[in-house]
Structure formats: structure tokens, C-alpha cells
């Protein structure tokens, strides 16, 4: 089955391609995959990866390698809202495991799972989200939430619809 990228996704990819030399379209593959994943409810299918490869003139294997290497890409259906808890050393020393435990209890799921209603996906361990000064922290739909407490976590999660 052949999938076509919607016009607005192709336009977004074109904006990224324009940032690189003409012979370096490959440099825009991460941004292209982000655009395709966002369009498809937060995950990539093989058909979507093939469409990105075709649009960029790349071998499909190159796109698959990128999509399966980086933790920011999902290759199976997941919840609408993506929650990532940083577990690197700075966050760990400031209570990230307690944050993970609290989120798992509150949502009734483990890392790598989505809530039964498909509302929230708790990503597997994130090695570093580059916000060490605000540890412990988590990212929800690409927005950083720092200096977390059980109360602030509950408020953040309760506001997700």
C-alpha cells in the first residue's frame, strides 16, 4: 500500500530541506519523520517511512535506521500525549525514580505503555532531556516541566485531555 504525504507535511519537509545544501537532503530526515509522525497520531508506519524516503530521494533503509534509532520516534500506536521522564544522573539524584513511580501509579501503566483510553503514553526511560538545572523534570508533548513534585505532576497529568 502506497501512502502519500499530505501537502502541508511536504511543505514542512521542504522548509527543512531548504536549510541544507541541495546535495544534503538526507540531513532533513529527522525533521521529516517528526512531521510524518505528528500527522499520524504520534507514530510512524512502514508506509509513512517509505513515503518520507521517496519524497527525500533516499533509500528506505536509511529512514528506517533513523526512525528506529532515536527514542523520539514511535513505530507502533501510542497515546495522544507523550510523557517522558528524564532519568539521567542529575534527575536521578533529585528524585526521578520517584517521579516515574508516581506517574505509573497515577496512570495505572508502566513505562512503554499507553493508558487504556489512549490518552497518555508514558515513554520508556529517557537518558537525558537537557534540563539538568530543573531536575527532576519531565517533558509532556515537547514542553518541559521542571522541579516536579507529586502535586505538580498530578496537575500536569490531570490537565491532559
Regions found by a protein language model. Give the residues of each.
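Signature of N-terminal electron-transfer/Fe-S-associated modules in redox systems
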Residues: 1-161
Amino acid at each position: 500500500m502506497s501512502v502519500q504525504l499530505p501537502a502541508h507535511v511536504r511543505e514542512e519537509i521542504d522548509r527543512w530541506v531548504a536549510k541544507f545544501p541541495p546535495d544534503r537532503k538526507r540531513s532533513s530526515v529527522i525533521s521529516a519523520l517528526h512531521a510524518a509522525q505528528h500527522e499520524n497520531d504520534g507514530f510512524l508506519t512502514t508506509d509513512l517511512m517509505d513515503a518520507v524516503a521517496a519524497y527525500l530521494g533516499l533509500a528506505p533503509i536509511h529512514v528506517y535506521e533513523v526512525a528506529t534509532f532515536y527514542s523520539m520516534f514511535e513505530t507502533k500506536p501510542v497515546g495522544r500525549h507523550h510523557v517522558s521522564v528524564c532519568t539521567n544522573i542529575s534527575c536521578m539524584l533529585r528524585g526521578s525514580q520517584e517521579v516515574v513511580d508516581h506517574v505509573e501509579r497515577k496512570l495505572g501503566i508502566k513505562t512503554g505503555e499507553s493508558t487504556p483510553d489512549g490518552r497518555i503514553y508514558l515513554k520508556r526511560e529517557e537518558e537525558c532531556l537537557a534540563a539538568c538545572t530543573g531536575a527532576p523534570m519531565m517533558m509532556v508533548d515537547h514542553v518541559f516541566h521542571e522541579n516536579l513534585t507529586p502535586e505538580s505532576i498530578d496537575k500536569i497529568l490531570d490537565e491532559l485531555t
